[in-house]
Regions:
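N-terminal leader segment of winged-helix/HTH proteins
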Residues: 1-49, 166-222
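Short amphipathic alpha-helical segments with heptad-repeat character
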Residues: 28, 32, 36, 80, ...
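N-terminal helix-turn-helix DNA-binding core of bacterial DNA-binding proteins
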Residues: 29-32, 40-82, 202-205, 214-255
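Charged, amphipathic alpha-helical coiled-coil/dimerization segments
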Residues: 91-150, 263-319, 323
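Exposed, interaction-prone assembly regions rather than primary DNA-binding/catalytic cores
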Residues: 144-178, 316-332
Length: 332
């Protein structure tokens, strides 16, 4: 049986269109796809508590904070997401009874998000399941997990996710602040198995967000987000520039509702048009427009220049990332 690797297929498409990204495009796409697979794995543990990945991450920050509460602005910074997204996430957690909004004791302009007792129970139960199952990386051995963590550590340090904190009095830097290692320490303190699989899974998540931020400068002029760009890219590289909505969802590893919403937005931007299926009246095709093709080409040029936020890695290192993650992707 011949195994077709969509990452390598996509990489070949990019190269044939003249975008030379070395091994960095394949590595960035592998990180994205693995992050999606880990998200799908996590949903099994999170679903009974009506938690999504973003809700769970926000709840975790509150759970592990000193007083169980944190300003919304700080929560946004910890999660590496836009304040608007944090507001929406906290709204959802508040409706579920997992979080309360409370006034800041000293700053009337600020609002705190505070985890509730119900939120703590949801965290404890879901984290126990996730840690027991290898955090979605059971296809790797410990050596591979450590190697991948070390490679992604270079990317995160280069992007400022890992910081050196100077000691008082101008002495040489005395310690390193790494949110991944801090989170690992917190997990161990609560009795959950952590180790290389936990820290590597969290590194993948944070690196995905950092790549997303790096690509934003190329996507923003065309009003594209990562999800919109990925959907548009699938259509751009398809044989006829069109695809059934269900198939598009499978390629993107997202729920059909999310695909519909994404295509709605792309249609409003005139980057995609919905057309009737030629033989199936029940089906609808999404077709990329000429404006959509120009947007893909311009944004891809920009992302190629920055090596997708992975410029700190050599081609050999980027290739190693792709190779290690292929074990996870094939198992998924």
């Amino acid at each position: 049986m011949v195994i077709v690797d969509p990452i390598r297929v996509a990489d070949e498409h990019w190269r044939t269109r003249g975008w030379d990204t070395g091994e960095h495009f394949a590595a960035s796409l592998s990180i994205y796809r693995t992050d999606e697979l880990i998200r799908l794995f996590d949903e099994v543990a999170l679903h009974p508590h009506r938690l999504t990945r973003s809700r769970h991450e926000a709840l975790a920050v509150l759970f592990f904070s000193r007083h169980g509460e944190i300003p919304l602005v700080t929560l946004s910074e910890r999660l590496l997401v836009h304040p608007t997204s944090v507001t929406s996430t906290v709204d959802s957690l508040e409706r579920l009874g997992y979080v309360d909004r409370v006034a800041h004791p000293t700053d009337r302009r600020a609002t705190l998000a505070r985890i509730t007792a119900k939120g703590r129970r949801a965290m404890q139960q879901s984290c126990s399941i996730i840690s027991a199952e290898g955090c979605g990386l059971a296809a790797l051995d410990e050596r591979q997990a450590v190697r991948l963590f070390n490679l992604l550590e270079r990317v995160r340090a280069d992007a400022g996710d890992i910081k050196r904190v100077d000691a008082p009095g101008g002495r040489k830097a005395s310690r390193v602040e790494d949110p991944v290692l801090t989170a690992e320490h917190n997990w161990r303190a609560h009795g959950w198995a952590a180790g290389p699989f936990f820290r590597t899974a969290l590194s993948i998540y944070r690196t995905t967000e950092l790549i997303r931020q790096s690509n934003e400068s190329a996507l923003r002029p065309h009003k594209l987000t990562h999800v919109r760009h990925e959907a548009l890219a699938v259509l751009y590289f398809s044989r006829r520039g069109e695809m059934m909505m269900g198939e598009l969802g499978k390629r993107l590893l997202v729920h059909p509702t999310s695909v519909t919403s994404t295509v709605d937005t792309l249609e409003r931007l005139k980057l995609v048009a919905r057309v009737a299926h030629p033989t199936d009246r029940r089906a609808t095709l999404a077709r990329i427009t000429m404006k959509g093709r120009r947007a893909i080409e311009a944004s891809n040029d920009g992302m190629t220049e920055t090596r997708f936020g992975l410029a700190v890695l050599t081609d050999t290192q980027a290739k190693a990332v792709t190779k290690i993650l292929s074990a996870v992707r094939l198992s998924g």
